[in-house]
């Protein structure tokens, strides 16, 4: 599914990823760990087709070394990848409904059926009453659960999570982790960048980066 071979990435003359090679198969549950500045988020951006400024070979979903703005890259992002970021990446001044509908933008369902899916996912994450609330009215833990709900809604094969529990209390951390593990059990590949040893220990594999290697 994903294969990196001799990937090197430099920023401002500094080597961030240094001749990195790895393979991630469909259905894997992977933690990427390492000290700050070791290249974890840089690697995730590369995996998610957010960054194409590197040397080496990168294959994802059968396509090799795609340019970020290429039609094939955008199709893969649209159809196969969900992102879950520490800062939630929600639109604060819009409603929960608006934010979740973005995950179903390219799904061929009626508005009624999409709303039903939204109601079901909000019940699953314990936020049934928030559909018409603005995101800015929710707590940090609630916003992250909405971000998780959006990732679950999108019919993706690959979930990329960058410190998804980093700013959460233990209760909300465990909820977010629970949903990520559930997505993996449904057959999705889940890759988590984390500083949390407990989160990493729940994964099938741990990739530790040190000075980009």
Please report, for each region that a protein language model flagged, where it lies by residue.
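Catalytic Walker B motif of ABC-type/P-loop ATPase nucleotide-binding domains
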Residues: 159-162
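Conserved signature/switch motifs of ABC ATPase nucleotide-binding domains
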Residues: 78, 133, 154, 186
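Conserved ABC ATPase signature
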Residues: 134-138, 142-144
């Amino acid at each position: 599914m994903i294969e990196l071979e001799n990937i090197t990435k430099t920023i401002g003359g500094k080597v961030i990823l240094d001749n990195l090679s790895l393979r991630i198969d469909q259905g894997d549950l992977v933690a990427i760990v390492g000290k700050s500045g070791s290249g974890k988020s840089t690697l995730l951006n590369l995996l998610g087709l957010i960054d194409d400024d590197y040397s080496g070979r990168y294959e994802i979903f059968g396509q090799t070394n795609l340019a970020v703005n290429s039609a094939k890259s955008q199709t893969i992002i649209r159809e196969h990848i969900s992102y879950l970021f520490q800062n939630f990446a929600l639109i604060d001044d819009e409603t929960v409904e608006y934010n979740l509908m973005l995950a179903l933008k390219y799904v061929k369902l009626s508005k009624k059926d999409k709303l039903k899916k939204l109601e079901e996912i909000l019940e699953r994450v314990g936020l049934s009453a928030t559909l018409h609330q603005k995101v800015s009215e929710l707590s940090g833990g609630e916003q992250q659960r909405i971000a998780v709900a959006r990732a679950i809604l999108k019919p993706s094969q690959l979930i990329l999570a960058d410190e998804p529990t980093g700013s959460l209390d233990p209760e909300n951390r465990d909820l977010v982790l629970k949903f990520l593990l559930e997505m993996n059990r449904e057959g999705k590949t889940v890759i988590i960048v984390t500083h949390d040893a407990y989160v990493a220990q729940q994964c099938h594999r741990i990739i530790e980066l040190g000075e980009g290697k």
